[in-house]
């Protein structure tokens, strides 16, 4: 017999039998949650709850204190409310879990020099939550893999049985507003402060929102104070987020700040090959190199391009070759390169070859200058919509036949010299990534 049952027997001796049978016998003692100084009972309905609280809660408290020789708090709760709350918590957890994309794993994240540090940091945190780097702040441009890495850690934590909440700042804000309107802030705070791991995307959108920054600060402190892991992403370093409170900026920097840079050519090639494998798209090495060379740094753009190529191929019943790829991506590449100018391309070539832009456009005929000029002309033709006469005028040539001759020479080199081809691809990648 537990202490709760013993108290009810003592109470039975002191009250009328009819009252005991009608009300007291329905009390259920919670042996798991009750402690020596805190007794918890459940009742089946509000009528019994009201009657016992009004008439016998003080008596029950007195009997407990006699038995335990210490002051005891007695809680009498409605059973279906407790069960409803548990169900709601499970529903919330399930909903948050479902927001994690199961395909975002460490295994299918392509690691290169541009993201190696961030990858290593997130991987380490997933192995020792709340111990190594807390918070972990990941920043970088759109489509570089911040969310993938964050959710990869979330999936690991979830598989360990931890309660993981993944959300964006926008969702966090909407949730906050809804609970304020409904006067249920306790539920909001319990939801976000009782989890084991909090993952929040796009933290820069806290900017200039004082009320939500205040609430997030207290949520952050509550979780950090008990060693719960926090991972945040943003498009820039905490110091560069305008309108972010100094105390939040300080706490974000107190953990580890890791950045992700645009992928270099080799990483883009690896990403394309991996996406082809996942999506069962067959591309030749030349096409993969072409896509990696001409697209910008956004990894999401790679996925879109592969989907577009696959769809065109299926609908038009044609094989995907290099010319087909160029035709399909023509409009998209023009849009991407709208900001590229002849000056920008020439400056990039000059910088790469350690000469002055003015020398490339000069009449100089030294071997180095001719080599640099030919590369600049080829890239200007490939990366802009300028005509050959326009290029001839820009580079100080008499007419477009000289441009045509240069393009032919570079084309031959690209076919016969693999090292030169790689050089052009890397230079193209630098120019398009920085535009």
Curated annotation (Swiss-Prot):
Region described as Domain I, interacts with DnaA modulators: 1-70
Source organism, top-level taxon: Bacteria
Gene Ontology BP, a term: regulation of DNA replication
Cellular component, GO annotation: cytoplasm; plasma membrane
Subcellular location field: Cytoplasm
Keywords: ATP-binding, Cytoplasm, DNA replication, DNA-binding, Lipid-binding, Nucleotide-binding
Pfam annotation, one family: DnaA_N
Main location: cytoplasm
Physiological role: Plays an essential role in the initiation and regulation of chromosomal replication. ATP-DnaA binds to the origin of replication (oriC) to initiate formation of the DNA replication initiation complex once per cell cycle. Binds the DnaA box (a 9 base pair repeat at the origin) and separates the double-stranded (ds)DNA. Forms a right-handed helical filament on oriC DNA; dsDNA binds to the exterior of the filament while single-stranded (ss)DNA is stabiized in the filament's interior.
Protein name in UniProt: Chromosomal replication initiator protein DnaA
Organism: Sulfurimonas denitrificans (strain ATCC 33889 / DSM 1251) (Thiomicrospira denitrificans (strain ATCC 33889 / DSM 1251))
């Amino acid at each position: 017999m537990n202490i709760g049952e013993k108290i009810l027997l003592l109470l039975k001796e002191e009250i009328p039998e009819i009252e005991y049978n009608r009300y007291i016998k329905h009390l259920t003692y919670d042996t798991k949650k009750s402690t020596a100084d805190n007794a918890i009972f459940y009742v089946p309905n509000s009528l019994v709850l009201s009657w016992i609280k009004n008439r016998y809660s003080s008596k029950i408290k007195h009997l407990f204190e006699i038995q335990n020789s210490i002051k005891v708090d007695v809680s009498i709760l409605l059973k279906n409310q407790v069960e409803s709350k548990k169900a709601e918590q499970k529903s919330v957890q399930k909903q948050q879990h479902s927001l994690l994309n199961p395909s975002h794993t460490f295994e299918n994240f392509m690691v290169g020099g541009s993201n190696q540090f961030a990858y290593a940091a997130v991987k380490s945190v997933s192995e020792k939550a709340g111990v190594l780097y807390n918070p972990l702040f990941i920043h970088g441009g759109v489509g570089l893999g911040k969310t993938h890495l964050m959710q990869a850690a979330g999936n690991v934590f979830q598989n360990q049985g931890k309660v993981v909440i993944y959300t964006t700042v926008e969702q966090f804000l909407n949730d906050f507003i809804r609970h304020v309107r409904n006067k249920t802030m306790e539920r909001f705070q319990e939801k976000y402060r009782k989890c084991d791991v909090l993952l929040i995307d796009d933290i820069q959108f806290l900017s200039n929102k004082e009320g939500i920054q205040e609430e997030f600060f207290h949520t952050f402190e509550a979780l950090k104070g008990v060693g719960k892991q926090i991972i945040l992403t943003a498009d820039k370093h905490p110091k560069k987020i305008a309108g972010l409170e100094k105390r939040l900026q300080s706490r974000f920097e107190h953990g580890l700040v890791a950045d992700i840079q645009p992928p270099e050519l080799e990483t883009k090639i690896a990403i394309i090959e991996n996406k082809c494998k996942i999506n069962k798209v067959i591309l030749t090495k030349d096409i993969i190199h072409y896509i990696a060379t001409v697209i910008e740094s956004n990894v999401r753009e790679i996925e879109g391009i592969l989907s577009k190529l696959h769809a065109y191929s299926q609908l038009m019943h044609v094989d995907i070759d290099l010319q087909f790829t160029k035709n399909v991506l023509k409009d998209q590449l023009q849009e991407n390169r709208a900001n590229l100018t002849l000056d920008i391309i020439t400056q990039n070539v000059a910088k790469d070859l350690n000469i002055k832009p003015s020398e490339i456009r000069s009449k100089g005929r030294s071997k180095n200058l001719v080599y640099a000029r030919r590369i600049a002309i080829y890239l200007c033709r490939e990366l802009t919509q300028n005509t050959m006469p326009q290029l001839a005028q820009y580079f100080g040539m008499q007419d477009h036949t000289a441009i045509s001759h240069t393009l032919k020479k570079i084309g031959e080199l690209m076919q016969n010299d693999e090292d030169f081809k790689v050089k052009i691809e890397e230079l193209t990648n630098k120019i398009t990534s920085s535009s």
